[in-house]
């Protein structure tokens, strides 16, 4: 898929799509992995149900699924997804309560075939690279940040602390 995108041979079926539909399908796509890893997946109730973007639903679902899958693989017990519409952009957030990503790994996380420290042995480093290429095609970008208390409306664990990683997918 990534090679086809890079070769510019993919035909996109772009139309207005709801972020809620992308997120729901991505969540469905990773439920078996969540069950296997005993990770709870939740969607922020404060999300904007009417938030939409102009993009290809299939490919955006592929991108978000890859990001959510990564978050689940590195979560301790929970992954949360939110989606919002602002005046200048729309945004999907995916955050977990696992280990943070090192600054060195953040520099390369979207590089094809890059497997950062702490990656499973069977990781080939394509998923996040593919996600970034898809989002970029639709005039977006992905931020990766450490999850801090001020990012969350409430915390992911009982100690009133937040750890983990947050992916912010922003569409302009």
Go through the PLM ranges and name each one.
Residues 8, 33-43:
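Short conserved segments within the C-terminal catalytic ATPase subdomain
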Residues 7-12, 50-55:
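Conserved micro-motifs of the catalytic ATP-binding
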Residues 78-88:
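Short beta-strand/loop element within the Bergerat-fold HATPase_c
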Residues 127, 131:
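Short alpha-helical Gxxx[C/S/T] motif in the catalytic ATP-binding
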Residues 13-28:
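A conserved beta-strand-to-alpha-helix junction within the catalytic ATP-binding
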Residues 101-114:
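Short conserved segment of the HATPase_c
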Residues 139-158:
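Glycine-rich ATP-binding loops of the HATPase_c
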């Amino acid at each position: 898929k990534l090679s086809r995108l890079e070769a510019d041979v993919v035909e996109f079926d772009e139309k207005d799509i709801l972020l809620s539909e992308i997120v729901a399908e991505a969540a469905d796509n990773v439920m078996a992995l969540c069950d296997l890893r005993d990770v709870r997946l939740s969607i922020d109730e404060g999300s904007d149900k009417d938030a939409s973007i102009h993009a290809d639903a299939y490919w955006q679902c592929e991108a978000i699924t890859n990001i959510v899958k990564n978050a689940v693989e590195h979560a301790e017990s929970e992954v949360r997804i939110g989606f919002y519409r602002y005046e200048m952009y729309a945004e999907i957030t995916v955050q977990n309560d696992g280990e943070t990503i090192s600054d060195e790994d953040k520099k390369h996380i979207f590089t094809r075939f890059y497997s950062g420290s702490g990656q499973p042995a069977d990781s080939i480093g394509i998923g996040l690279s593919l996600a970034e290429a898809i989002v970029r095609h639709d005039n977006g970008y992905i931020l990766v940040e450490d999850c801090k208390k001020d990012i969350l409306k409430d915390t992911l664990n009982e100690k009133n602390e937040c750890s983990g990683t947050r992916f912010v997918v922003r569409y302009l």
